[in-house]
Amino acid sequence: MMNNPMMNPMIQNYMGNNMRQMGQMDQKNIGLTRLNKEYQLCSKDMDLIQIGCNFGLENDLYHWRVTMTGPKNTPYEGGLFFISIIFPEDYPTHGPEFKFLNKIYHLNVDWKNDLGHICINSINSWRTSGKVIGRPVYTVKQALLDIFCLFFKQGVESAYDKGMADDYVNNTEKFNEEAKKWTKDFAPMN
């Protein structure tokens, strides 16, 4: 395998070892190549989102941890939010799973049944489509930008909690106060 200066060294080393053992490019190495491309895309022009790969004790390249800062003039201002991205072994055939790791008071984040699950149609359809092979139609960078947009917009139509959605529609000020409180309690910057 040729050395690629643009490739994350850990991914390149992992791929090189696997390819030497197997002598061919299998689904896992296709996924690792795509992961490297995704990482490179996410590393460019993402001032508001910090991408950090948490490789874990076992050098788990399929689990990333992302940090997002709550934007100004939103109830999430001053918050530091962590998102877990778990890529399936058959990536990119199936998309990754995105979850908030710390609590956030938001209509489109589930804290009752599936802790931290994010409901965005584009992410959910990507995860289950099984059709994303080869050139990426939807990327991790786009998914992260979609998640970042959640700080500015609540998706009432896809809210997890009807009571919370009613509060948002009928008393946005009360909703925003609760979101600020959760940000202070569960996502403090310091």
Residue map of PLM features:
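Domain-scale recognition of soluble eukaryotic interaction modules
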Residues: 2-42, 95-190
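Proline-anchored loop/turn motifs at beta-strand termini and strand-loop-strand connectors
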Residues: 86-95
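Flexible, active-site-adjacent loop/turn segments at secondary-structure boundaries
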Residues: 74, 89, 103-107
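N-terminal onset of structured domains
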Residues: 22-28, 32, 36-80
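Alpha-helix initiation and capping sites
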Residues: 74-79, 91-92, 141
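Hydrophobic residues in beta-strands and at strand termini
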Residues: 68-70, 87, 100
